[in-house]
From Swiss-Prot:
The keyword Cell membrane does not apply. Its cofactor is [2Fe-2S] cluster. The Rieske iron-sulfur protein is a high potential 2Fe-2S protein. GO terms for molecular function: 2 iron, 2 sulfur cluster binding; electron transporter, transferring electrons within cytochrome b6/f complex of photosystem II activity; metal ion binding; monooxygenase activity; oxidoreductase activity, acting on paired donors, with incorporation or reduction of molecular oxygen; plastoquinol--plastocyanin reductase activity. Component of the cytochrome b6-f complex, which mediates electron transfer between photosystem II (PSII) and photosystem I (PSI), cyclic electron flow around PSI, and state transitions. The chain crosses the membrane at residues 21-43. Its main location: membrane. This is Cytochrome b6-f complex iron-sulfur subunit.
Amino acid sequence: MAQFSESADVPDMGRRQFMNLLTFGTVTGVALGALYPVVNYFIPPATGGAGGGTTAKDELGNDVSVTKFLENRNAGDRNLVQGLKGDPTYIVVDSKEAIKDYGINAICTHLGCVVPWNVAENKFKCPCHGSQYDETGKVVRGPAPLSLALAHTNVSDDKIVLTPWTETDFRTGDAPWWS
């Protein structure tokens, strides 16, 4: 009678173990593939551009050219662009040839609504709960507890570049609460 002996040629994994391993690998791969966009959603956009800043984007996601931006705008105009961390940011027109050296984050410090610029009253007015900010974004009427955040605006290769504001807030004389 012939006896079977274990040899190196005989695999030690049975059919059931192989199918379990194959199923586990497939399910794990699909789960990781499905989780990737979910995890990516919670990671803020990387900053790039000149000096660690973010190039301002228009409503279509294109880089904002300073010359085109200033073509149809007057001194004192405030126009929204996509700024640091993807937040809506107002670029302030200084003259027909230049923009101010700061941008104003349009997110209300009360509950996070986007605050529109009211040209008739020369101030920002939050539509959600009535907070009001002056032309520089300083809070003048609550319930918002703080002024709107600032960002530096620079021009590099005809593009508007926003960088974080870390110096003293010129409106209040205090350290910036947002940095």
